[in-house]
C-alpha cells in the first residue's frame, strides 16, 4: 500500500471500499487523489487506460471482475480492512444452526469449501476452521 503514496486511486462511490479508505486516514492522506466511480467496472476500465494507479474494491468483487475481464490486473496481498459475514437463523433454530456449523467445518476440513471458493471466487477466501 505504501507504493500507492502520491498516486491516484479509484473507488466505487458509496461502497464498503470507500468506507475502508475513509477509515484508514494514513492511507487516505498519502494519496494524491481519490477518484469516485459509479461502478467498479468503470473504475477498472480507467485503471486499464492509466487514468488511476489502482482501484480499491472488495476482494470477492475484484476476483470476479478480473476473472471475467481476462485483464492482467494484480491484487495486492495487503488489505485495508476485513469484513465479516454471517448466516442468520431464527433464535429458536438452534439445531439448524448447529447442523450448518458442523457441515461448514466438515467441508473446510475435507477441502470442499476451498474448492467451491476457488470455482466461484477465483481464490480460496474461506475463513471457516482457520
Question: What residue spans do the PLM features occupy?
Answer:
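Flexible hinge/capping segments at coil-to-helix
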Residues: 1-8
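Hydrophobic residues within well-ordered alpha-helices
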Residues: 4, 47-48, 87, 100
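Short coil/turn segments
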Residues: 9-17, 91-93
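Periplasmic-binding protein-like
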Residues: 17, 59-120, 123-130
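Ligand-binding cleft/hinge of the Venus flytrap
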Residues: 17-36, 66-70
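Short helix-initiation/N-cap motifs at beta->coil->alpha
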Residues: 34-45, 83
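Short, hydrophobic alpha-helical packing/hinge segments within bilobed ligand-binding/sensory domains
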Residues: 43-46, 52, 62
Amino acid at each position: 500500500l505504501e507504493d500507492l503514496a502520491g498516486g491516484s486511486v479509484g473507488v466505487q462511490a458509496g461502497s464498503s471500499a470507500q468506507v475502508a479508505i475513509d477509515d484508514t486516514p494514513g492511507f487516505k492522506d498519502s494519496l494524491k487523489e481519490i477518484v469516485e466511480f459509479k461502478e467498479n467496472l468503470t473504475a477498472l476500465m480507467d485503471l486499464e487506460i492509466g487514468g488511476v494507479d489502482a482501484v480499491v474494491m472488495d476482494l470477492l468483487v475484484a476476483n470476479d471482475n478480473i476473472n471475467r475481464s481476462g485483464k492482467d490486473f494484480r491484487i495486492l496481498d495487503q488489505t485495508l480492512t476485513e469484513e465479516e459475514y454471517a448466516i442468520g437463523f431464527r433464535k429458536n433454530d438452534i439445531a439448524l444452526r448447529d447442523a450448518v456449523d458442523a457441515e461448514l467445518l466438515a467441508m473446510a476440513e475435507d477441502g470442499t469449501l476451498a474448492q467451491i471458493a476457488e470455482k466461484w471466487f477465483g481464490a480460496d477466501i474461506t475463513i471457516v476452521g482457520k
